[in-house]
Amino acid sequence: MTNQIQKTISVCIIGRPNSGKSTLLNRIIGEKLSIVTPKVQTTRSIITGIVTLKDTQIILYDTPGIFEPKGMLEKAMVRCAWSSVYSADLVLSIIDSLKPLDNIAHNILNQFCLLNIVPIFLLNKIDIESKYLNDIKAFLKITHPKSLLFPISALLGKNVDVLLEYIKSKAKVSPWLYADDDITNLPMRFIAAEITREQLFLNLQQELPYKLTVQTEKFEELKDKSIKINQVIVISRENYKAIILGKNGAKIKDIGVKSRVQLEQFFCVPVHLFLFVKVHAFWENNQEFYQYMKI
Protein backbone atom coordinates (compact mmCIF):
# COMPACT_ATOMS: atom_id res chain seq x y z
CA MET A 1 0.00 0.00 0.00
CA THR A 2 1.27 3.47 -0.86
CA ASN A 3 0.62 6.81 0.81
CA GLN A 4 -0.02 8.65 -2.45
CA ILE A 5 -2.51 11.48 -2.44
CA GLN A 6 -5.77 10.30 -3.93
CA LYS A 7 -8.01 12.45 -6.11
CA THR A 8 -11.53 11.85 -7.43
CA ILE A 9 -13.90 13.48 -9.89
CA SER A 10 -17.35 12.57 -11.16
CA VAL A 11 -18.14 13.27 -14.80
CA CYS A 12 -21.52 13.26 -16.54
CA ILE A 13 -21.68 12.59 -20.30
CA ILE A 14 -24.85 14.03 -21.79
CA GLY A 15 -26.15 14.68 -25.29
CA ARG A 16 -28.49 13.62 -28.05
CA PRO A 17 -29.05 9.93 -28.92
CA ASN A 18 -26.28 8.38 -31.02
CA SER A 19 -23.91 11.28 -30.43
CA GLY A 20 -21.23 8.93 -29.09
CA LYS A 21 -21.72 9.01 -25.31
CA SER A 22 -21.49 5.25 -24.78
CA THR A 23 -18.60 4.92 -27.23
CA LEU A 24 -16.70 7.57 -25.28
CA LEU A 25 -17.29 5.88 -21.93
CA ASN A 26 -16.11 2.54 -23.33
CA ARG A 27 -13.05 4.21 -24.85
CA ILE A 28 -12.06 5.87 -21.57
CA ILE A 29 -12.43 2.82 -19.32
CA GLY A 30 -10.93 0.50 -21.94
CA GLU A 31 -13.78 -2.02 -21.78
CA LYS A 32 -17.12 -2.43 -23.53
CA LEU A 33 -19.35 -1.64 -20.58
CA SER A 34 -22.06 0.52 -22.13
CA ILE A 35 -23.98 -1.14 -24.97
CA VAL A 36 -23.79 0.47 -28.42
CA THR A 37 -26.11 -0.02 -31.40
CA PRO A 38 -27.00 2.02 -34.50
CA LYS A 39 -30.51 2.51 -33.08
CA VAL A 40 -31.32 5.65 -31.13
CA GLN A 41 -32.21 5.52 -27.44
CA THR A 42 -30.26 2.32 -26.80
CA THR A 43 -29.11 3.54 -23.38
CA ARG A 44 -32.03 3.64 -20.96
CA SER A 45 -30.36 4.27 -17.63
CA ILE A 46 -27.22 5.77 -16.16
CA ILE A 47 -24.24 3.51 -16.80
CA THR A 48 -21.43 4.13 -14.33
CA GLY A 49 -17.90 3.59 -15.55
CA ILE A 50 -14.80 3.87 -13.36
CA VAL A 51 -11.21 4.43 -14.41
CA THR A 52 -8.24 5.07 -12.13
CA LEU A 53 -5.30 6.87 -13.73
CA LYS A 54 -2.31 7.06 -11.37
CA ASP A 55 -3.53 9.16 -8.43
CA THR A 56 -6.91 10.11 -9.93
CA GLN A 57 -10.13 8.11 -9.96
CA ILE A 58 -12.67 9.23 -12.57
CA ILE A 59 -16.29 8.18 -12.16
CA LEU A 60 -18.17 8.52 -15.44
CA TYR A 61 -21.92 8.58 -15.96
CA ASP A 62 -23.14 7.60 -19.42
CA THR A 63 -26.71 8.84 -19.72
CA PRO A 64 -29.74 8.18 -21.94
CA GLY A 65 -29.89 10.43 -24.98
CA ILE A 66 -31.84 13.67 -24.69
CA PHE A 67 -34.82 13.84 -27.05
CA GLU A 68 -38.47 14.90 -27.04
CA PRO A 69 -40.11 12.17 -24.92
CA LYS A 70 -43.67 10.99 -25.42
CA GLY A 71 -44.52 7.94 -23.34
CA MET A 72 -43.92 7.32 -19.64
CA LEU A 73 -40.75 5.29 -20.27
CA GLU A 74 -39.22 7.93 -22.53
CA LYS A 75 -39.95 10.69 -20.01
CA ALA A 76 -38.31 8.63 -17.27
CA MET A 77 -35.21 8.18 -19.44
CA VAL A 78 -34.82 11.91 -20.05
CA ARG A 79 -35.34 12.71 -16.35
CA CYS A 80 -32.72 10.10 -15.56
CA ALA A 81 -30.23 11.77 -17.91
CA TRP A 82 -30.65 15.23 -16.42
CA SER A 83 -30.51 13.91 -12.85
CA SER A 84 -26.85 12.98 -13.23
CA VAL A 85 -26.00 16.53 -14.27
CA TYR A 86 -26.87 17.89 -10.84
CA SER A 87 -24.53 15.59 -8.93
CA ALA A 88 -21.52 15.55 -11.27
CA ASP A 89 -18.39 17.61 -10.72
CA LEU A 90 -17.95 18.07 -14.46
CA VAL A 91 -20.43 17.92 -17.35
CA LEU A 92 -19.36 16.78 -20.81
CA SER A 93 -21.88 17.75 -23.49
CA ILE A 94 -21.16 15.59 -26.51
CA ILE A 95 -22.27 16.86 -29.91
CA ASP A 96 -22.38 14.99 -33.21
CA SER A 97 -20.35 17.31 -35.43
CA LEU A 98 -21.71 15.65 -38.57
CA LYS A 99 -25.16 17.15 -37.98
CA PRO A 100 -26.36 20.75 -37.64
CA LEU A 101 -27.65 21.93 -34.29
CA ASP A 102 -31.41 21.31 -34.28
CA ASN A 103 -34.22 22.24 -31.88
CA ILE A 104 -33.34 19.48 -29.42
CA ALA A 105 -29.69 20.55 -29.38
CA HIS A 106 -30.73 24.15 -28.75
CA ASN A 107 -33.03 23.02 -25.94
CA ILE A 108 -30.10 21.23 -24.30
CA LEU A 109 -27.95 24.36 -24.60
CA ASN A 110 -30.72 26.51 -23.14
CA GLN A 111 -31.15 24.09 -20.25
CA PHE A 112 -27.47 24.46 -19.36
CA CYS A 113 -28.02 28.22 -19.10
CA LEU A 114 -31.13 27.80 -16.96
CA LEU A 115 -29.27 25.44 -14.62
CA ASN A 116 -26.23 27.74 -14.53
CA ILE A 117 -24.03 24.89 -15.75
CA VAL A 118 -20.83 25.48 -17.71
CA PRO A 119 -20.33 22.26 -19.67
CA ILE A 120 -17.32 21.09 -21.62
CA PHE A 121 -18.39 20.62 -25.24
CA LEU A 122 -17.07 17.57 -27.06
CA LEU A 123 -17.41 17.90 -30.83
CA ASN A 124 -17.43 14.23 -31.72
CA LYS A 125 -16.81 12.26 -34.93
CA ILE A 126 -14.02 14.49 -36.24
CA ASP A 127 -12.57 11.41 -37.95
CA ILE A 128 -15.12 12.20 -40.68
CA GLU A 129 -15.02 15.54 -42.50
CA SER A 130 -17.96 17.72 -41.50
CA LYS A 131 -19.36 20.82 -43.17
CA TYR A 132 -21.03 21.80 -39.88
CA LEU A 133 -18.05 21.69 -37.52
CA ASN A 134 -16.88 25.29 -37.90
CA ASP A 135 -20.41 26.68 -37.63
CA ILE A 136 -21.02 24.68 -34.44
CA LYS A 137 -17.76 25.96 -32.94
CA ALA A 138 -18.60 29.56 -33.80
CA PHE A 139 -22.10 29.28 -32.35
CA LEU A 140 -20.96 27.72 -29.08
CA LYS A 141 -18.26 30.35 -28.58
CA ILE A 142 -20.98 33.00 -28.73
CA THR A 143 -23.66 31.28 -26.63
CA HIS A 144 -21.36 29.59 -24.09
CA PRO A 145 -18.16 31.68 -23.99
CA LYS A 146 -16.98 30.16 -20.69
CA SER A 147 -17.10 26.59 -22.00
CA LEU A 148 -14.12 24.77 -23.45
CA LEU A 149 -14.43 22.94 -26.77
CA PHE A 150 -12.69 19.63 -27.45
CA PRO A 151 -12.91 18.18 -30.98
CA ILE A 152 -12.65 14.40 -30.52
CA SER A 153 -13.25 11.04 -32.12
CA ALA A 154 -14.64 8.72 -29.44
CA LEU A 155 -14.54 5.85 -31.93
CA LEU A 156 -10.85 6.19 -32.77
CA GLY A 157 -9.75 7.83 -29.52
CA LYS A 158 -8.46 11.00 -31.16
CA ASN A 159 -7.85 13.76 -28.59
CA VAL A 160 -9.39 11.63 -25.83
CA ASP A 161 -6.02 11.64 -24.07
CA VAL A 162 -6.06 15.45 -24.08
CA LEU A 163 -9.58 15.39 -22.65
CA LEU A 164 -8.51 13.00 -19.90
CA GLU A 165 -5.62 15.25 -18.89
CA TYR A 166 -8.07 18.12 -18.53
CA ILE A 167 -10.47 16.00 -16.46
CA LYS A 168 -7.61 14.93 -14.19
CA SER A 169 -6.61 18.56 -13.69
CA LYS A 170 -10.08 19.27 -12.28
CA ALA A 171 -10.08 16.40 -9.78
CA LYS A 172 -10.00 17.26 -6.09
CA VAL A 173 -8.11 15.60 -3.28
CA SER A 174 -10.47 12.96 -1.94
CA PRO A 175 -10.24 9.23 -1.12
CA TRP A 176 -11.11 6.90 -3.97
CA LEU A 177 -14.58 5.44 -3.78
CA TYR A 178 -13.65 2.18 -5.51
CA ALA A 179 -10.73 -0.20 -5.92
CA ASP A 180 -8.21 0.90 -8.53
CA ASP A 181 -9.13 -1.99 -10.85
CA ASP A 182 -12.92 -1.54 -10.68
CA ILE A 183 -14.60 -0.49 -13.94
CA THR A 184 -18.18 -0.15 -12.68
CA ASN A 185 -20.39 -0.34 -9.61
CA LEU A 186 -23.29 -1.91 -11.50
CA PRO A 187 -24.56 -5.36 -10.44
CA MET A 188 -23.45 -8.22 -12.67
CA ARG A 189 -27.10 -9.17 -13.21
CA PHE A 190 -27.79 -5.73 -14.66
CA ILE A 191 -24.76 -5.84 -16.95
CA ALA A 192 -25.75 -9.30 -18.20
CA ALA A 193 -29.26 -8.05 -19.01
CA GLU A 194 -27.84 -5.07 -20.90
CA ILE A 195 -25.61 -7.33 -23.00
CA THR A 196 -28.58 -9.44 -24.07
CA ARG A 197 -30.69 -6.33 -24.72
CA GLU A 198 -27.94 -5.09 -27.03
CA GLN A 199 -28.25 -8.24 -29.13
CA LEU A 200 -32.02 -7.84 -29.26
CA PHE A 201 -31.53 -4.29 -30.54
CA LEU A 202 -29.07 -5.49 -33.16
CA ASN A 203 -31.12 -8.45 -34.37
CA LEU A 204 -34.73 -7.27 -34.20
CA GLN A 205 -36.19 -4.84 -36.68
CA GLN A 206 -38.12 -1.58 -36.53
CA GLU A 207 -39.79 -0.68 -33.23
CA LEU A 208 -39.78 -4.07 -31.50
CA PRO A 209 -36.56 -3.51 -29.50
CA TYR A 210 -38.19 -0.50 -27.87
CA LYS A 211 -41.16 -2.63 -26.79
CA LEU A 212 -39.15 -5.00 -24.61
CA THR A 213 -36.87 -5.17 -21.62
CA VAL A 214 -34.61 -7.88 -20.21
CA GLN A 215 -34.35 -9.10 -16.63
CA THR A 216 -31.73 -11.46 -15.23
CA GLU A 217 -33.60 -13.80 -12.92
CA LYS A 218 -30.65 -16.05 -12.07
CA PHE A 219 -26.92 -15.36 -12.01
CA GLU A 220 -25.10 -18.30 -10.47
CA GLU A 221 -21.38 -18.97 -10.33
CA LEU A 222 -20.84 -22.72 -10.63
CA LYS A 223 -18.11 -24.86 -9.08
CA ASP A 224 -16.21 -25.03 -12.37
CA LYS A 225 -16.05 -21.18 -12.39
CA SER A 226 -18.58 -20.94 -15.22
CA ILE A 227 -21.74 -18.85 -14.86
CA LYS A 228 -25.35 -19.92 -15.30
CA ILE A 229 -27.64 -17.08 -16.37
CA ASN A 230 -31.42 -17.23 -16.72
CA GLN A 231 -32.98 -14.20 -18.38
CA VAL A 232 -36.52 -13.18 -19.22
CA ILE A 233 -37.30 -11.04 -22.25
CA VAL A 234 -40.38 -9.07 -21.22
CA ILE A 235 -42.73 -7.95 -23.99
CA SER A 236 -46.05 -6.11 -23.88
CA ARG A 237 -47.94 -8.06 -26.55
CA GLU A 238 -48.44 -11.74 -27.30
CA ASN A 239 -47.86 -11.28 -31.04
CA TYR A 240 -44.30 -10.08 -30.36
CA LYS A 241 -43.38 -13.51 -29.02
CA ALA A 242 -43.47 -15.24 -32.41
CA ILE A 243 -41.16 -12.60 -33.89
CA ILE A 244 -38.60 -12.98 -31.10
CA LEU A 245 -38.73 -16.77 -31.14
CA GLY A 246 -38.56 -17.02 -34.94
CA LYS A 247 -39.32 -20.10 -36.99
CA ASN A 248 -38.77 -23.19 -34.83
CA GLY A 249 -37.03 -20.96 -32.27
CA ALA A 250 -34.24 -20.03 -34.68
CA LYS A 251 -34.25 -16.29 -33.94
CA ILE A 252 -34.00 -16.52 -30.16
CA LYS A 253 -31.38 -19.25 -30.48
CA ASP A 254 -29.26 -16.99 -32.69
CA ILE A 255 -29.68 -14.08 -30.28
CA GLY A 256 -28.76 -16.36 -27.38
CA VAL A 257 -25.58 -17.54 -29.09
CA LYS A 258 -24.47 -13.98 -29.88
CA SER A 259 -25.30 -12.80 -26.38
CA ARG A 260 -23.42 -15.70 -24.79
CA VAL A 261 -20.30 -14.81 -26.79
CA GLN A 262 -20.44 -11.23 -25.51
CA LEU A 263 -21.12 -12.37 -21.96
CA GLU A 264 -18.12 -14.70 -22.02
CA GLN A 265 -15.92 -11.90 -23.36
CA PHE A 266 -17.02 -9.60 -20.55
CA PHE A 267 -16.90 -12.06 -17.65
CA CYS A 268 -13.91 -14.04 -19.01
CA VAL A 269 -15.47 -17.40 -18.08
CA PRO A 270 -17.79 -19.88 -19.84
CA VAL A 271 -21.45 -18.86 -19.67
CA HIS A 272 -24.57 -21.03 -19.80
CA LEU A 273 -27.34 -18.72 -20.99
CA PHE A 274 -31.04 -19.57 -20.95
CA LEU A 275 -33.53 -17.13 -22.46
CA PHE A 276 -37.28 -17.06 -21.88
CA VAL A 277 -39.99 -14.78 -23.27
CA LYS A 278 -42.74 -13.44 -21.04
CA VAL A 279 -45.72 -11.22 -21.86
CA HIS A 280 -46.41 -8.45 -19.36
CA ALA A 281 -48.99 -6.01 -20.72
CA PHE A 282 -48.12 -2.35 -20.20
CA TRP A 283 -44.78 -3.11 -18.55
CA GLU A 284 -43.64 0.32 -19.82
CA ASN A 285 -46.00 1.91 -17.28
CA ASN A 286 -44.94 -0.28 -14.36
CA GLN A 287 -42.63 1.36 -11.81
CA GLU A 288 -41.23 -2.01 -10.72
CA PHE A 289 -39.57 -2.39 -14.11
CA TYR A 290 -38.18 1.14 -13.87
CA GLN A 291 -36.55 0.27 -10.55
CA TYR A 292 -34.91 -2.77 -12.14
CA MET A 293 -33.73 -0.62 -15.06
CA LYS A 294 -32.44 1.98 -12.56
CA ILE A 295 -34.40 4.90 -14.01
UniProtKB/Swiss-Prot annotation:
Annotated spans, G3: 62-65
CC per GO annotation: cytosol; plasma membrane
Transmembrane annotation, as ranges: none
Segments forming domain Era-type G: 7-176
Known role: An essential GTPase that binds both GDP and GTP, with rapid nucleotide exchange. Plays a role in 16S rRNA processing and 30S ribosomal subunit biogenesis and possibly also in cell cycle regulation and energy metabolism.
UniProt KW Cytoplasm keyword: yes
Protein name: GTPase Era
Primary gene name: era
Subunit structure: Monomer.
Region (G2): 41-45
Chain positions covered by the region annotation G5: 152-154
InterPro entries xrefs: G_ERA_dom, GTP-bd, GTPase_Era-like, KH_dom-like_a/b, KH_dom_type_2, KH_sf_prok-type, P-loop_NTPase, Small_GTP-bd
Organism listed in the record: Rickettsia prowazekii (strain Madrid E)
Binding site for GTP: 15-22, 62-66, 124-127
Pfam families with a match to the protein in the record: KH_2, MMR_HSR1
Membrane topology, record value: Peripheral membrane protein
Region (G4): 124-127
Localization annotation: Cytoplasm; Cell inner membrane
Stretches for region G1: 15-22
GO BP annotations, alphabetical order: ribosomal small subunit assembly
Keywords, comma-separated and alphabetical: Cell inner membrane, Cell membrane, Cytoplasm, GTP-binding, Membrane, Nucleotide-binding, Ribosome biogenesis, RNA-binding, rRNA-binding
Ranges of residues in domain KH type-2: 204-281
PANTHER family from the UniProt entry: GTPASE ERA, GTPASE ERA, MITOCHONDRIAL
Family membership noted in the UniProt record: Belongs to the TRAFAC class TrmE-Era-EngA-EngB-Septin-like GTPase superfamily. Era GTPase family.
GO MF term set: GTP binding; GTPase activity; ribosomal small subunit binding; small ribosomal subunit rRNA binding
